[in-house]
């Protein structure tokens, strides 16, 4: 764990001068490096796969701690049952370490659910809109299967129109069902 902490911290430069040669490039001011590192950290927090990868070592550590505390408690309870005095009167609480373990498991479950939802949306997007619009960040790059923006807009408008038609059909159907429901109840 200490090795991970050492790798994530930018190297310290000499004092003086407003710039430092760091891990992000030579001549970049320290404040800018910290800001870029902060942005990278925020991006990793939003990515469920990266978050999952970060939580796995914590889960392993928590499980090891949980097993260690369980073993200590078992030894202490065995000594008490055998009538032996225990010199280690201070044993950590099992319930707190179990709660920590379950909290990490819950976070992992949320990350997996979010990753699954992102993947499902990506598949649905590729299925219903398989062609891409050229990105503004790379106007020089030629994308073979891309649509011009005007065609993309017309496709989106047709999808919205279809969704509205489905919505209206469902509303009409529900009104018909509601209209028939009082008649069948009145006949009873």
Curated annotation (Swiss-Prot):
Pfam families: Med29. The keyword Transcription applies. Residues 1-11 have a biased composition (Polar residues). Residues 1-27 are annotated as: Disordered. The keyword Transcription applies. InterPro entries: Mediator_Med29_met. Keywords: Activator, Nucleus, Transcription, Transcription regulation. It comes from the Eukaryota. One of its GO terms (cellular component) is mediator complex. It is found in: Nucleus. Belongs to the Mediator complex subunit 29 family. Component of the Mediator complex. Component of the Mediator complex, a coactivator involved in the regulated transcription of nearly all RNA polymerase II-dependent genes. Mediator functions as a bridge to convey information from gene-specific regulatory proteins to the basal RNA polymerase II transcription machinery. Mediator is recruited to promoters by direct interactions with regulatory proteins and serves as a scaffold for the assembly of a functional preinitiation complex with RNA polymerase II and the general transcription factors. This is Mediator of RNA polymerase II transcription subunit 29. It comes from Xenopus tropicalis.
């Amino acid at each position: 764990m200490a090795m991970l902490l050492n790798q994530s911290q930018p190297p310290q430069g000499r004092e003086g001068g407003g710039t430092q040669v760091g891990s992000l490039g030579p001549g970049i001011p320290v404040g800018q490096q910290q800001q870029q590192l902060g942005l990278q950290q925020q991006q990793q927090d939003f990515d469920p796969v990266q978050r999952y990868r970060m939580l796995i070592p914590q889960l392993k550590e928590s499980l090891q701690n949980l097993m260690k505390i369980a073993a200590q408690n078992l030894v202490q309870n065995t000594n008490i049952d055998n009538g032996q005095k225990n010199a280690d009167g201070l044993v950590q609480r099992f319930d707190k370490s179990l709660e920590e373990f379950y909290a990490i498991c819950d976070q992992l479950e949320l990350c997996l659910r979010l990753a699954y939802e992102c993947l499902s949306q990506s598949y649905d997007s590729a299925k219903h809109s398989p062609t891409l619009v050229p990105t503004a960040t790379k106007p020089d790059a030629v994308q073979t299967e891309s649509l011009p923006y005007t065609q993309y807009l017309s496709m989106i408008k047709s999808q919205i129109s279809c969704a509205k038609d489905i919505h209206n059909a469902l509303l009409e159907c529900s009104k018909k069902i509601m209209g028939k429901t009082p008649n069948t109840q009145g006949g009873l």
